Structures are given as C-alpha cells and as structure tokens.
C-alpha cells in the first residue's frame, strides 16, 4: 500500500518553534505526497490584510491567537493538506481539537540552531526583544509539553538537509499510522 493510500487524505500539521523548518519541510512534504501546502500565518495575513507584526501591534498576542484559531478551524475542514502552523498554535487547548484531526509532526530543533536561523528576521514579533535567546528559551519552556503531544517528534540537527528530514518523516509515517493508538509520540533522532 502506498503512503498516500495509507494516509487516506489525512492532513499533516507541522508544529515547532519559529525557525524549525515548518515552511521549508512542509512544501517538500506536500510536493512529495501530491498534497496542497498551507501556511497558517500566510492565511492569517491574507484574511486580515495585515502582517503578523501589525496584528500583534494592534490586537496583541491574544487577538492574534483568536484569529489563528479561526483560521485553523477552517483549514482543518479540508483534506490532503500539509499545514505549516505558527509556533504558538499549540498554546490554546481548543486548537488541539483541530490539530488532532490530522497527523501532528513536531520539528524539534536545538535553540542555538534556531537563533542562527532567525538572526536578523524582523517578522518575528515575539523575538523583538533585548535578549532573543532568553525569549526563545522561555518560549521553548512554555511550549515544550504542548509540542510533546504531537504524534511524531523529529529531532533535527543544524547540518541536516531539509530533503533528508522530509525523507525521514515519510519513512516513519506508516509506523505512526499503524501505532496511532499509542499515546506517546514516536521519536526520530538524527
């Protein structure tokens, strides 16, 4: 049985901290599976006509999270999607009712590598602080238990090519589908 057949239209939701590769790996997965790629942050910008930093500035994080939940609810009603989510989508418990309609994949990248990837990125409102490393570590501490609720954890090291990460995900999905009754996420190390 092919992987696409085994998935039977099940959406793949990529979660992880900002800079973890959700966009890059999401596009690769979608292309490989013949799925449609969707980025929740891009959808939020399209729906509101504002950038993420503008939404944070005018509506605060709480306002942004409400819009994010509405967008996720809509996205979850479709099938055959690979969805790159915003890093904080796991915070709101109600979002899990939508995420769990698909296969949730946590892209787990070490903090130093995330900082390297995000250096100079002005489109990350939560990192516009005097100490981005401290902020990123705090976000990790706040969200780690939520990310751990994913069906699959993929540990990614700095030197790993996104194509390799995509292949590792594709190779392990069948066993995750087979063992979906298990409550702990499968873990794939590099």
UniProtKB/Swiss-Prot annotation:
Its main location: cytoplasm. Gene3D superfamilies: P-loop containing nucleotide triphosphate hydrolases (3.40.50.300). ATP binds at residues 19-24, 124. Disulfide bonds: none annotated. It is an enzyme of class 2 (transferase). Its EC number is 2.7.1.71. Mg(2+) binds at residue 23. Substrate binds at residues 41, 65, 87, 143. It is found in: Cytoplasm. GO terms for cellular component: cytosol. It catalyses: shikimate + ATP = 3-phosphoshikimate + ADP + H(+). GO terms for biological process: amino acid biosynthetic process; aromatic amino acid family biosynthetic process; chorismate biosynthetic process. One of its GO terms (molecular function) is ATP binding. The keyword Chloroplast does not apply. Binds 1 Mg(2+) ion per subunit. Keywords: Amino-acid biosynthesis, Aromatic amino acid biosynthesis, ATP-binding, Cytoplasm, Kinase, Magnesium, Metal-binding, Nucleotide-binding, Transferase. InterPro entries: P-loop_NTPase (IPR027417), Shikimate/glucono_kinase (IPR031322), Shikimate_kinase/TSH1 (IPR000623), Shikimate_kinase_CS (IPR023000). Its cofactor is Mg(2+). Catalyzes the specific phosphorylation of the 3-hydroxyl group of shikimic acid using ATP as a cosubstrate. Monomer. Belongs to the shikimate kinase family. This is Shikimate kinase. It comes from Synechococcus elongatus (strain ATCC 33912 / PCC 7942 / FACHB-805).
């Amino acid at each position: 049985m092919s992987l696409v057949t085994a998935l039977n239209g099940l959406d793949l939701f990529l979660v992880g901290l900002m800079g973890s590769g959700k966009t890059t790996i999401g596009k690769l997965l979608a292309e490989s599976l013949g799925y449609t790629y969707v980025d929740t942050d891009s959808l939020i910008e399209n729906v509101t006509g504002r950038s993420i930093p503008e939404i944070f500035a005018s509506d605060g994080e709480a306002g942004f999270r409400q819009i994010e939940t509405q967008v996720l609810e809509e996205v979850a009603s479709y099938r055959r999607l690979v969805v790159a989510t915003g890093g904080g989508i796991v915070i709101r418990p109600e979002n899990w009712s939508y995420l769990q309609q698909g296969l949730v994949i946590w892209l787990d990248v070490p903090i130093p590598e995330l900082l390297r990837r995000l250096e100079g990125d002005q489109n990350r409102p939560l990192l516009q602080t005097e100490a981005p490393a401290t902020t990123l570590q705090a976000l990790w501490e706040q969200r780690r238990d939520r990310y751990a609720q994913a069906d699959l954890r993929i540990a990614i090291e700095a030197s790993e090519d996104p194509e390799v990460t995509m292949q590792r995900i594709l190779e392990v999905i069948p066993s995750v589908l087979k063992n979906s009754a298990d409550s702990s996420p499968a873990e794939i190390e590099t």
